[in-house]
């Protein structure tokens, strides 16, 4: 079954300006079998649980993608190049 992604187009454009990462590229980390996902309690609410997934994009960039589950789709909220600490954690766990 293929994963379905959705996002706000205005946020997607703003994300490219701010973080130099497109949501199209960000969506490719979910195909990385070595990616890891953690719950983000600080940015979650009773109405929406948020998660951060760290993984390698199709371009080989290690990205951190904030997202939530919308039933049949993954809604991407933001994406950026992973921090040094996040990259180290990703590399050590694989």
Where do the PLM segments sit?
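Ribonuclease/tRNase effector modules and their secretory precursors
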Residues: 1-94
């Amino acid at each position: 079954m293929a994963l379905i992604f959705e996002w706000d187009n205005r946020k997607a454009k703003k994300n490219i300006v701010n973080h130099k990462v497109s949501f199209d590229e960000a969506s490719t980390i979910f195909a990385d079998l070595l990616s890891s996902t953690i719950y983000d309690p600080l940015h979650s609410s009773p109405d929406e649980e948020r998660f951060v997934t760290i993984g390698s994009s199709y371009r080989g960039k290690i990205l951190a993608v904030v997202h939530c589950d919308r039933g049949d789709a993954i809604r991407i909220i933001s994406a950026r190049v992973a921090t040094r600490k996040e990259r180290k954690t990703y590399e050590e766990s694989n």
